């Protein structure tokens, strides 16, 4: 029987982290708050099709419709006017978050060419992990024939961990493939 990531966290990971870091209360154990998937689209101001195809791709990947982010100020150097779409973002919480994380760990990351693990140095100092992917083709939902251009995306995994060591231990115990540094 395959055990889900949320069940694995509740049954084995919380107890292991509680023993490893000597937490007195179960609520001190780090947990996931949200996962944010972001894609910057500089060309969206000139190419409306790029925005539409990116929205469709992120909807397929996450199962949730992304929010269009717009420019707050006009910047002549970047040829951006105020209120022009410049990116899209999705915030995943609860079951969709665990489902996406399980798919990322077990299906998506192993499909990267020459994959030797992800860097353990991408923590922000507060236990949150940031990951940049260079292409959307590694996701099983994306069909190679239906994309117009290869675009990357950023994934931020937000946890309640106080330190990077706690966040690293949480992700390692859930099976995140970190490379040995």
Curated annotation (Swiss-Prot):
Cited InterPro entries: Ribosomal_uL5 (IPR002132), Ribosomal_uL5_bac-type (IPR020930), Ribosomal_uL5_C (IPR031309), Ribosomal_uL5_CS (IPR020929), Ribosomal_uL5_dom_sf (IPR022803), Ribosomal_uL5_N (IPR031310)
Pfam families: Ribosomal_L5, Ribosomal_L5_C
BP GO terms, sorted: translation
CC annotations in GO: chloroplast; ribonucleoprotein complex; ribosome
UniProt keywords, alphabetically: Chloroplast, Plastid, Ribonucleoprotein, Ribosomal protein, RNA-binding, rRNA-binding
Localization, UniProt: Plastid, Chloroplast
One Gene Ontology term of the molecular function aspect: rRNA binding
Assembly and binders: Part of the 50S ribosomal subunit; contacts the 5S rRNA.
Annotated function: Binds 5S rRNA, forms part of the central protuberance of the 50S subunit.
Family: Belongs to the universal ribosomal protein uL5 family.
Protein known as: Large ribosomal subunit protein uL5c
């Amino acid at each position: 029987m395959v055990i889900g990531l949320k069940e694995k966290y509740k049954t084995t990971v919380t107890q292991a982290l509680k023993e490893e870091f000597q937490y007195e209360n179960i609520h001190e154990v780090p947990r996931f708050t949200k996962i944010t998937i972001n894609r910057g689209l500089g060309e969206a101001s000139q190419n409306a099709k790029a925005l539409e195809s990116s929205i469709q791709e992120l909807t397929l990947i996450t199962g949730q419709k992304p929010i269009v982010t717009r420019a707050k100020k006009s910047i002549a150097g970047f040829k951006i006017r105020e209120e022009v779409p410049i990116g899209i973002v999705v915030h995943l919480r609860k079951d969709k978050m665990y489902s996406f994380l399980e798919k990322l760990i077990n299906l998506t990351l192993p499909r990267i060419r020459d994959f030797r693990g992800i860097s353990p140095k991408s923590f922000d100092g507060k236990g949150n992990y940031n990951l940049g992917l260079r292409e959307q083709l590694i996701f099983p939902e994306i069909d190679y024939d239906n994309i117009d251009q290869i675009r990357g995306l950023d994934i931020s995994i937000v946890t309640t961990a106080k330190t990077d060591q706690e966040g690293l231990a949480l992700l390692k115990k859930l099976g995140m493939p970190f490379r040995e540094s």
